[in-house]
Each structure stands twice: as structure tokens, then as C-alpha cells.
């Protein structure tokens, strides 16, 4: 199930930057103080500030035709496995999602 989180974030990142002249999606994996971390970043148009506190709310979406359940399911999966998901974004510059996993579980 944790693989589903990564797949969803990658899909979202690709969609977010597809209209950029030079789309870029980056994935980094590392340990922060012994905790496994994966980040998924894109250079899309970012998330507007007024939407930042809603991105993990079920059925909230800013995408045409989106269901709004993807990121809420991602958070549920990460929480269920003792991990976490967070997001930072800057309009016109892009978005980074950070996954932190329990020390005993890695993808």
C-alpha cells in the first residue's frame, strides 16, 4: 500500500508540471536522523496558499475532473503504517511532498 502513495505522488507531480516548458520531477530518498525519507518534487505552478490546508481533505481538488481522494488516501496509508506525509509549495515554483517512514519499514 505504501507503494500506492509514491505512485500517486509521482502521477500528481507529472500532471502538475506537464505544461511547463521544461517539466521536472525529482525523487530523493535519504535518512534524516535515522528516519527513512522520500521526497517527490515538481516544478509545476504550485498550490495556492488558500488551498494548502485542504490538500489532504477528502474530496477537495483543484484539478479539473479530479476526485479529490488521492492525497487523503495517501495520508491515511502513511498514518496507518506509522509514517507521515507533508507538503510545501510555492506558487509558480513547484511543490514538494515529503514521506517519512517508521525506522523499521521502508518501501
What are these regions (language model features)?
Residues 70, 74:
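Short alpha-helical Gxxx[C/S/T] motif in the catalytic ATP-binding
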Residues 22-34:
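Short beta-strand/loop element within the Bergerat-fold HATPase_c
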Residues 46-54:
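Short helix N-cap motif at coil->helix boundaries in the Bergerat
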Amino acid at each position: 500500500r505504501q507503494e500506492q502513495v509514491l505512485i500517486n505522488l509521482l502521477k500528481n507531480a507529472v500532471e502538475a508540471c506537464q505544461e511547463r516548458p521544461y517539466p521536472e520531477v525529482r525523487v530523493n530518498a535519504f535518512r534524516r536522523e535515522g528516519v527513512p525519507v522520500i521526497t517527490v518534487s515538481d516544478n509545476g505552478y504550485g498550490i495556492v496558499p488558500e488551498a494548502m490546508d485542504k490538500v489532504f481533505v477528502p474530496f477537495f481538488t483543484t484539478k479539473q475532473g479530479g476526485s479529490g481522494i488521492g492525497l487523503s488516501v495517501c495520508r491515511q496509508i502513511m498514518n496507518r503504517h506509522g509514517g507521515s506525509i507533508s507538503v510545501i509549495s510555492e506558487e509558480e515554483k513547484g511543490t514538494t511532498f515529503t514521506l517519512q517512514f517508521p525506522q523499521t519499514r521502508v518501501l
